Amino acid sequence: MKNILRLTLNGRAREDLVPDNMLLLDYLRETVGLTGTKQGCDGGECGACTVLVDDRPRLACSTLAHQVAGKKVETVESLATQGTLSKLQAAFHEKLGTQCGFCTPGMIMASEALLRKNPSPSRDEIKAALAGNLCRCTGYVRSSKSVETAAAARLCEEGAR
């Protein structure tokens, strides 16, 4: 059975006819065409599919699309503006926190959720925020440094205002 799904996706209101059993991951990738959210384990284990739902990290591979009805959903595509990387994305690039890139969107979205909640996280808080995201390439040191760099850049920007 299909029903209408209404949500705000990356700042825009959407309304789509979606099967009741469709996963949020499939909705984003197949229906909407947003492929930044990666399909990794399909079991809620790797974090590659992390998106933000009302500013909180959520695994799109284990969330039905209809569970986000009426909510604000953000994917990694929402972070760059007019082709310019966000401070967080730029920090991941600068600090080589991307390597193969497969886990990067999920890492970035988990980090974005952390920085929105806590603009100046400790290393332990960063480690805890990234704990649900598996990375076989970087060993997490570069990812953690990326988050620290982005946090400092954001705080510096806020102080300049």
Curated annotation (Swiss-Prot):
Its cofactor is [2Fe-2S] cluster. Residues 3-79 form the 2Fe-2S ferredoxin-type domain. Inactivated by low concentrations of cyanide in vitro. It holds the Pfam family Fer2. Keywords: 2Fe-2S, Iron, Iron-sulfur, Metal-binding, Oxidoreductase. GO terms for molecular function: 2 iron, 2 sulfur cluster binding; 4-hydroxybenzoyl-CoA reductase activity; metal ion binding. The keyword RNA-binding does not apply. [2Fe-2S] cluster 2 binds at C100, C103, C135, C137. CDD domains: fer2. [2Fe-2S] cluster 1 binds at C41, C46, C49, C61. The keyword Metal-binding applies. It is an enzyme of class 1 (oxidoreductase). Component of a complex that catalyzes the reductive dehydroxylation of 4-hydroxybenzoyl-CoA to benzoyl-CoA. Reaction is not reversible. Is a key enzyme in the anaerobic degradation of phenolic compounds. Heterohexamer of two alpha, two beta and two gamma subunits. This is 4-hydroxybenzoyl-CoA reductase subunit gamma. The lineage of its organism: Bacteria, Pseudomonadati, Pseudomonadota, Betaproteobacteria, Rhodocyclales.
